[in-house]
Regions:
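Bacterial N-terminal signal peptides that target proteins for export
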Residues: 1-7
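Short hydrophobic/aromatic beta-strand or adjacent loop that forms the aromatic wall/cage
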Residues: 124-126
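Short, solvent-exposed loop/turn segments at conserved positions within beta-propeller repeat blades
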Residues: 120-122
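N-terminal helix-cap/turn-to-beta initiation motif at the start of protein domains
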Residues: 20-34
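Compositionally biased regions
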Residues: 15-17, 21, 41
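Contiguous, well-ordered beta-strand patches that form the walls/edges
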Residues: 34-52, 58-118
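Bacterial N-terminal signal peptides
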Residues: 7-16
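Short beta-strand-to-coil "C-cap" segments at the C-terminal boundary of structured domains/repeats
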Residues: 128-134
């Protein structure tokens, strides 16, 4: 289960944002974020993992728990905004950025979540992240 969380979170990486609103979100995402809540398939992460889960946005890249950067696109014309992760395993998601709080919910194989929650057998992962003040 821990490996599943790490692998799924590792896919949330690198930003290419269209349009002016997207450019503003790109700037707002910069920095380090720490998970304060997470679920995958309706279940919480293994003990101790949540406290270690960090995401760092730098320029057009993002790394999860120190992993290699991965690219994704953000489309702010949708509500909630869409995130598409561009790697070998297609992931699509939604996100909401409000100040120092970032909600992310992603699914695999083109199954975009419709809400910021997960249920058993959905292959969706949800995270609530808070900005780390450095």
């Amino acid at each position: 289960m821990e490996r599943r969380f790490i692998l799924l979170f590792a896919f949330l990486l690198s930003v290419s944002l269209p349009g002016n609103a997207g450019a503003q979100n790109k700037v707002a995402l910069q920095g380090k974020w720490r998970a304060v809540e997470a679920t995958s398939n309706g279940e919480p992460p293994p003990a101790g993992l949540l406290e270690k889960l960090t995401i760092v946005f730098v320029g057009e890249t993002v790394s999860v728990m120190g992993s290699s950067p991965t690219r994704f696109t953000i489309d702010t014309s949708f509500r909630p905004a869409h995130i598409d992760i561009l790697n070998s395993r297609r992931q699509v998601g939604i996100y909401e950025l409000k100040g120092d709080a970032l909600k992310l919910c992603v699914g695999t194989d083109g199954d975009r979540p419709k809400a910021f929650r997960t249920e058993k057998y959905t292959d969706h992962t949800y995270m609530l992240l808070k900005r780390v003040k450095e």
